[in-house]
Amino acid sequence: MQKTTLIQILATSTILLSALSVHAESDGNRGYVGRNANGCKGLPSYEQLKSALVSAVAADSTGFNLNMWATIVDRDGVVCAVAFSGADRGSQWPGSRVISAQKANTANAFSLDGLALSTANLYSAVQGTSDASPLGGSLYGLQFSNPVDTAVAYGGNPAAVGTKFDPMVGNRVGGINVFGGGLALYNSSKKVVGALGLSGDTSCADHNQAWLVRKNLGLDNLAGIGGVSGDATRPDNIVYDSINGNSNNITDGWEQPICANTSNPTSLPAVK
């Protein structure tokens, strides 16, 4: 009887361990232990992101001069840091926290060592059919791919959001966003190492301030890398039809619409 009981216990234990193993493999988005367990170790820290963000917000006067959220992801899409520029988490649009993470994920997911694409560059390409564009954009449907992991985006203690211990840190949030504010990060070897996303104002201001944050972090080493902006010194810059675009009164190609208090994209610093 004792031998039979022991065999039953061992068999049950084996089944439980197998189930746990399968669950761990099927839920590979969980289990990271902060930023030190992944590719975040070579990217800016929370403190560095916060400092770069506050400086960028202060330096830019486009949009409505609102406070911002910023997120950095590594090359695997793992969130490394989340920060805000205001006095507390309620000083900027609460919904923009997840949007900033979506933008970072998008810019990382669709940029390469040889091709930098900002989230602003994707706006027209994902549009459906219309009178102005009877055939629709060449990437229509992209915005519905790679959905946000809602457990990562909305889980954890709300009091920790935007701090060093933001619940998204160490996890892959996913998501696709197709207006300005997301930029890939390039190291001194001109290799893409992750991406940055900003949200909290007009999408044009989001792009401008993300551009300044990337420069402040020293991760704008993409001179000579391919892009769709038509400006080799700013490969992944935002494109507006009436300023640096096709000037055909249609938002098409790689353009996105202008915003309130829009500035000329060529006024942004050239990349390195």
Predicted regions and their residues:
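Bacterial N-terminal signal peptides
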Residues: 10-18
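N-terminal signal peptide c-region/cleavage motif recognized by signal peptidases
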Residues: 19-23
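Flexible, solvent-exposed loop/hinge segments and secondary-structure transition points
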Residues: 25-272
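Bacterial N-terminal signal peptides that target proteins for export
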Residues: 1-10
